[in-house]
């Protein structure tokens, strides 16, 4: 068992390293891990024809992970000869984090912000230091916050100040359940702070903004549905990727307004240590997140309107 543990640590180090070495060695090491069973008691998983993992993610990543899972399934089978079945769960990031912390078995989490994963880590399920487990602070792609308005921008919404007007109705998710909503809040606060406003004034501005919100959905995709399908609101505060996806699906019906100030959003990923060790799924779970940094996956992120962490591909 000690030799297997040492071997596992070696494997993990190589899989987490970047560049072509990781790509060359991943197949050999992953196959060897499966052959050895990695830990005592994990032999049945290693010998199984199919392994299953659960990815608990936030609302607007549905299309990204639907495509990525197909890519990863092919990659894993080519590397190891074993099939992998990936179960997806999507919802407001804060709500998803609480579900995992309260017992929803997730092998990996791909959530909207570091704080939501810290909620799970604080429950003892994820080891501390998760932001250093993968490159770029464990954020394989980023985004920002923009406004989506209806064709012609009838209310002439140009910046955060306009969202305080009494004639403007706003759609944004609930910060209590949605990670995207918290990024929205931070972006607005950052703008008013940059205008030299006092904390007291900014707090009042935020109250006014939220008084203009018609519906506080639990997640970003719900807010998009409220704005697009239900036709409510003059402006949707949205992830950049979600806004571009909406324009792709409804060409000519909407416009993106880029406010003068916003924030760089860093969705974070992590392996749920307690779950993968219990389910003997660490090898496939770690490679699932590692492969998000591959050229193929980074290009896929860009195609889904995320900003790839790999700056060469982002160009």
Regions found by a protein language model. Give the residues of each.
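Residues embedded in well-ordered beta-strands
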Residues: 146-148, 255, 268-270
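Early extracytoplasmic/lumenal segment of secretory-pathway proteins
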Residues: 43-123, 133-134
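Short, low-complexity disordered leader/linker segments with a strong preference
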Residues: 2-52
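Ligand-binding pocket segment of bilobal, Venus flytrap-like solute-binding proteins
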Residues: 195-260
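Extracellular/periplasmic juxtamembrane helices and adjacent flexible linkers that interface
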Residues: 276-315
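A conserved helix-loop-strand patch within extracytoplasmic ligand-binding domains
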Residues: 121-193
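Alpha-to-beta junction loops
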Residues: 103-110, 167-168, 230-238
């Amino acid at each position: 068992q000690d030799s297997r543990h040492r071997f596992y640590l070696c494997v993990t180090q190589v899989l987490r390293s970047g560049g072509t070495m990781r790509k060359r060695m991943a197949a050999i090491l992953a196959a060897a891990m499966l052959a050895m069973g990695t830990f005592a008691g994990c032999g049945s998983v290693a010998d199984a024809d199919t392994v299953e993992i659960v990815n608990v993610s936030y609302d607007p990543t549905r299309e990204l992970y639907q495509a990525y899972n197909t890519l990863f399934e092919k990659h894993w089978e080519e590397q190891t000869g074993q099939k992998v079945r990936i179960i997806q769960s999507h919802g407001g990031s804060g709500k998803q984090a609480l579900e995992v912390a309260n017992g929803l078995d997730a092998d990996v989490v791909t959530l909207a912000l570091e704080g939501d994963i810290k909620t799970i880590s604080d429950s003892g399920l994820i080891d501390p230091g998760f932001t250093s487990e993968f490159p770029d602070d464990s954020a394989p792609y980023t985004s920002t916050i923009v406004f989506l308005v209806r064709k012609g921008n009838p209310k002439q919404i140009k910046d955060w100040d306009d969202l305080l007007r009494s004639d403007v109705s706003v759609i944004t998710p609930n910060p209590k359940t949605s990670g995207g909503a918290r990024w929205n809040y931070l972006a607005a606060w950052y703008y008013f702070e940059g205008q030299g406003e006092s904390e007291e004034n900014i707090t009042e501005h935020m109250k006014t903004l939220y008084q203009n919100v018609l519906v506080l959905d639990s997640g970003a995709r719900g807010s998009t549905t409220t704005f697009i399908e239900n036709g409510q609101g003059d402006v949707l505060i949205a992830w950049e990727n979600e806004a571009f996806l909406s324009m792709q699906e409804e060409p000519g019906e909407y416009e993106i307004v880029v406010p003068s100030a916003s924030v760089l959003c860093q969705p974070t990923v992590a392996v749920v240590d307690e779950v993968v060790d219990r389910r003997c799924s660490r090898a496939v779970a770690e490679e699932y997140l590692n492969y998000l940094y591959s050229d193929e996956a980074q290009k896929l992120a860009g195609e889904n309107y995320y900003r790839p962490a790999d700056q060469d591909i982002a160009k």
